[in-house]
Amino acid sequence: MAQGPLKKTKPSTAKRPTALAPKRGPRQIAPKKATLIKQQKITKKLTAGLTAKTERTLAQRAGHLELLAGGKKDKKAEKEKGKEKGGKKN
């Protein structure tokens, strides 16, 4: 049997997210041996060259797409033509 009145429930507070920022990844320990340091420098140089080359090719392809019909330049030209034809109406 119940001994006393039931406890009133308190309104729950809004839950705060435990992680406010993205979780940090594992830290990389720098190599100590001279051969490994040299190897790391070479790989860094090569990967930088590869990324630069891929970015350059992507930029060329994007530029080539603008030359085709329907690019940004064509849309701007069409807007200007529309303004010239319409003019001001009094």
Swiss-Prot record:
It comes from the Eukaryota. Pfam families: DUF2462. Residues 1-37, 61-90 are annotated as: Disordered. Residues 71-90 have a biased composition (Basic and acidic residues). PANTHER family: LEYDIG CELL TUMOR 10 KDA PROTEIN HOMOLOG. Belongs to the UPF0390 family. This is UPF0390 protein AFUA_1G03640. It comes from Aspergillus fumigatus (strain ATCC MYA-4609 / CBS 101355 / FGSC A1100 / Af293).
